[in-house]
């Protein structure tokens, strides 16, 4: 299942949203259009919030089915709201990190994470413990902002178009997923800013072309509605139990 939307006129969906197999975090908006769309199409808990009064929560946080990492700039009220809105077994943790746009410097699925090389060792340890993943300091090509220039689920990884074949192969072997280079929103290199995905759906910016969407659906293994519905039910049922 794949969709193309905008967030109050912006196609940078990844900047305003974080989507995992167990929850979705979305920036607070003036209209209810995006929230209503998510409530109708995403069968997991949704939390609408700000982080440090900023709506671009996708750039500020990073998580998976096990946990959610938020920057130290988040207010007590905001983190309490997030904790109360997510499943009880999802650990929400602040990180005291200089590079506090966590969504831009961390990229993960439910098993592995790659991070900006300049993150603190303490941050690396928290990422490993909270998200329950193996952690590697790894660029995407020449780009250290892995969350900006890559998008990842448990089946595949989309990377920016100037990622060499050698780097794609290296990432594929490291992450044990298929890795494909592509663009988003009609040619943008910032693929992480333009699409979010879990294991049964993806949401891309409204400017994304049909060709770009076909590449995205292929790398994330999101073709075949019946198979995706069965996958969604299996994952959601496991969460409920």
UniProtKB/Swiss-Prot annotation:
Keywords: Cytoplasm, Initiation factor, Nucleus, Protein biosynthesis, Ribosome biogenesis
GO biological process, alphabetically ordered: cytosolic ribosome assembly; ribosomal large subunit biogenesis; ribosomal subunit export from nucleus
GO molecular function, one term: ribosomal large subunit binding
SMART domains, sorted: eIF6 (SM00654)
Subcellular location: Cytoplasm; Nucleus, Nucleolus
Chief location category: cytoplasm
GO CC entries: cytoplasm; nucleolus
Disulfide links within the chain: none
InterPro entries: eIF6
Top-rank taxon: Eukaryota
Protein task: Binds to the 60S ribosomal subunit and prevents its association with the 40S ribosomal subunit to form the 80S initiation complex in the cytoplasm. Is also involved in ribosome biogenesis. Associates with pre-60S subunits in the nucleus and is involved in its nuclear export.
Family listed: Belongs to the eIF-6 family.
Assembly notes: Monomer. Associates with the 60S ribosomal subunit.
This protein's name: Eukaryotic translation initiation factor 6
